[in-house]
C-alpha cells in the first residue's frame, strides 16, 4: 500500500490516497478526489492549498471492519470519515466551527475511507456513473471532516444543500433528486 499524492499545485489541497483494492485502479481517483476536495473548500471560502485530506480506497471487507470498530456497525458502507478535530456546531442546524486557514494545526482535516464494492453497487442501482457517485461521497465525507453532519433534519438540510451547490460547480446533477440506495 503506497500512498499517492496529487501533483504539486500550490493552489490545490493535498490529497493523499492509499489504495488497498485494485478495483479502484479503473477510476482516476486521484484527479476525482482532488477536484471534489478543492470544490468543497472553495464553496466554504477556504483556500484549498492550506488543507490536507487522506483517503483509504478499500474494499467492502475492510470498510466493514472499520465500520464495526469505529461505529459498532460491522457491515459495509460507502464512506467513513475521521475528522482531525471536532468542528461540530453548537446547536442543531448551526454552522460548524470551520478551520482557520492560518492555523498550522488546522492543515490536516482528517481521513476518509471509501469501499469500492458498495460505491459501485450504489451507482449501478441508481443508474449513475461511478465517478459521479464517488465524487459526491468525497464531497460528503469532506463536509463531515469540516464538522457538518446529518443527524437532525436541520443539519441534513444544511449539509445536503451544500453538497448540491458544490456538485453543481463540478457540473454534476443533484444526487438527491434520485435517492442513492
Curated annotation (Swiss-Prot):
Keyword Transmembrane carried by entry:
no
* Compartment(s): Cytoplasm
Single GO cellular component term? cytoplasm
Which sites bind Zn(2+)?
140, 144, 150
* GO BP: any one term: rRNA processing
What cofactors are annotated for this protein?
Answer: Zn(2+)
Q: Cite the entry's keywords alphabetically.
A: Cytoplasm, Endonuclease, Hydrolase, Metal-binding, Nuclease, Ribosome biogenesis, rRNA processing, Zinc
GO MF: metalloendopeptidase activity; RNA endonuclease activity; zinc ion binding
Cofactor: how and how many bound: Binds 1 zinc ion.
EC numbers for this chain: 3.1.-.-
Q: Which Gene3D superfamilies match?
A: Metalloproteases ('zincins'), catalytic domain
Would the keyword Nucleotide-binding be found if you checked this record's keyword annotation?
Answer: no
What domain of life does the UniProt record list for this protein's source?
Answer: Bacteria
Protein family: Belongs to the endoribonuclease YbeY family.
Q: What does this protein do?
A: Single strand-specific metallo-endoribonuclease involved in late-stage 70S ribosome quality control and in maturation of the 3' terminus of the 16S rRNA.
The name of this protein is Endoribonuclease YbeY
Protein's organism = Dinoroseobacter shibae (strain DSM 16493 / NCIMB 14021 / DFL 12)
Q: Which gene encodes it?
A: ybeY
